[in-house]
Amino acid sequence: MDLMQMDKRLDSTEQVVEEIMRIHRSLPARPGIDEVEAAKGLIDNVEKEDQACLEAIARQRKSSEVPGELFMVLQEMKKGYVQFRSKEQIREALKLLDLESVHSLFDDFIQRASNCIASPSSNGSVSSRPPLPPATTTAARSDSQSSLNFSERAPVRPKDMVSRDDSFVTKSKPSSLYSDGFAAPPRRPQILDSTLTTGNDGEKLSLIKLASLIEVSAKKATQEINLQNKLTEQLEWLPDSLGKLSSLTSLDLSENHIVVLPNTIGGLSSLTKLDLHSNRIGQLPESIGELLNLVYLNLGSNQLSSLPSAFSRLVRLEELDLSCNNLPILPESIGSLVSLKKLDVETNDIEEIPYSIGGCSSLIELRADYNKLKALPEAIGKITTLEILSVRYNNIRQLPTTMSSLASLKELDVSFNELESVPESLCFATTLVKLNIGNNFADMVSLPRSIGNLEMLEELDISNNQIRVLPDSFKMLTKLRVFRAQENPLHIPPRDIAEKGPQAVVQYMNDLVETRNAKSLMVKPKKSWVQMCFFSKSNKRKQSSMEIV
C-alpha cells in the first residue's frame, strides 16, 4: 500500500468506500482453511518435538573427566539450538496465522462498513449503495486426479472461490463500487507448492507447505504422493498429520534428509508402497508394524542399526530393501515374512543370517553382498523357491550341504569369499544357470567332481583361484557360453585352450576323457606264470572238491 495516500482527504462516502476496498485488496492472498489447520498442527508438532529434545538434554549425565562448567556450556548451547531451530520451523506457520488473523479482523471491518452503508446516514438520507460484499478466501483446488506427483507437474488453474464463512457469500453481481469491477482480487489457491505451477526447477517444500499438502491430500483421499527429492534440507522430520492419509496407497519420500518418522505413520492403513531410500533415518517406530497392507518397502541408504520387533507383522510384504545401512544382525522375526519374494541386505555389517530365514517360504531373490558373513545357515535349503542367491564380498568358508534342496536356484554368486571348496551336494541344484565362485584366491583348489550334473549352466566364473585341473564331468556342460578362468594355474586344460572359449574347453575335456577311455580298453594286463599256476591249482582243488561231493 502507498503510505503517501494515508493522509489523503476523503470528501464523500464513495471515496471512503473505495479507500476501504483499496486497503483490503492490498492484503496478501488469504490462506486456505487447510493451510490454517496445517499451521496450527505444525506448531503443536514443533512444541512436542522441542519438549522431547529438552528432556533428552536434561537426562544427559556428565562424565567425571569433564569439567562441570564445560558440560553446562554444552547443555545450554544444545537448548539454545533447539529453540532457534523451532523458531525457524514455525516461522512460516506463525506468519500464515498472523495473516489469517488480519483477514479475520478485516472481515469485521467490512461487515461494519456494509452496515453503515445500509443504515440511514447521519444527514437523514438512506444510501442507495448496496452493502459491501465480504472478503473471499482461497479454496482447495478440486482435482479429478487422485495422485500428487511432484515429478510430473501441471499448471494450476484458478477455480471458483468460496468464502471462509458461508454467511458472507454473496451471489449478486459485483458492485460497481469497485473500479476494477471485482469485490476482491482473484486469488490463486495457496495450498499447493509452487512446484505444481513451475518447471522442474521449482523450489522445494518447506515444513509448512508439506503440512498443508498433507491436509489437502487427506481431505481429497489422495492415493499417491511422490515427494522424491522435494523436501528442503532443513526438513528432518515429518508432521504427525501424516497419519491422516488413510487412503494413501503409495508414498515416495526418497532422496531427502529425513531423520525420524512420526509414530502416526501407522495410520496409513491403505499403504502398499513406501519408498524411503536415501535419507538419514536411524530408527523405525514400532508403529510401522501397523502397515499391514504394505507390499513394497525400500529403506536402503539410511542409518538403521536395528529393526523393530513389529516388523514381523508385515506378512504381506513382498519386497524389502535394507541395503546400505548399519545393521549388525537380522532379527529372528525376519522369518515371519512369509510373502517376501525379494530381500536385499547388501552393504551392512551382518555377521550371520538367522536360521529363521527358512520361514521365508516365498523368497525368490536374496542379496547379502558386502557384509561380514562367515557362513550360511543350513535352513537356506528350506527355501525351495529361491532363484537368486548373491553373497559376494563376505568371509564365507563353506557352503551348507542343504543347498542341494534348492530346486529352483538359477544364480549363485559366492565370489570374493574364503571358500576352500564347493560341496558335491551343490551339483544336485541342477537348475543353476549362473555360478560365480571366482576370487576365493588361495583357498579354492578344485571343483566338485560331479559339476557336470549342472547341465543347464551357461555362465561359470572360477577366476583368481588355485585350480589346476578341471574334473572329467566338465565335458557335460554343453550349454556353457561364458567361462572365466583367468589367474588360475590351469594344467588341464592348457591355458591356450581355456583362452579359446567355453565350448573349446568342453570339447577338449570330452576328447581327453574319450582318449583316456579308449586307451584303457586297448591295454589289457598279461598274467604272469605265477598267477597262471596259482589259478590252475586253485581250479583243480575246486574241481576235486566238487567230485568228492
Swiss-Prot record:
Ranges annotated as biased composition (Polar residues): 141-150
GO cellular component terms listed in the entry, alphabetical order: plasma membrane
The species this protein was found in: Arabidopsis thaliana (Mouse-ear cress)
Biased composition regions of type Basic and acidic residues, renumbered to the chain: 154-167
Keyword presence, Phosphoprotein: yes
LRR repeats (start-end): 245-268, 269-291, 293-313, 314-337, 339-360, 362-383, 384-406, 407-430, 432-454, 455-476, 478-500
Chain ranges for the short sequence motif GVYW as given in the UniProt record: 501-508
Gene3D superfamilies according to UniProt: Ribonuclease Inhibitor (3.80.10.10)
Compositionally biased tracts (Low complexity): 119-140
Tissues where the protein occurs: Widely expressed.
Keyword Transmembrane helix: no
Protein name: Plant intracellular Ras-group-related LRR protein 4
Matching InterPro entries: Leu-rich_rpt, Leu-rich_rpt_typical-subtyp, LRR_dom_sf, LRR_domain-containing, LRR_R13L4/SHOC2-like
Modified residues (Phosphoserine): 167
Function: Leucine-rich repeat protein that likely mediates protein interactions, possibly in the context of signal transduction.
Family: Belongs to the SHOC2 family.
Domain of life: Eukaryota
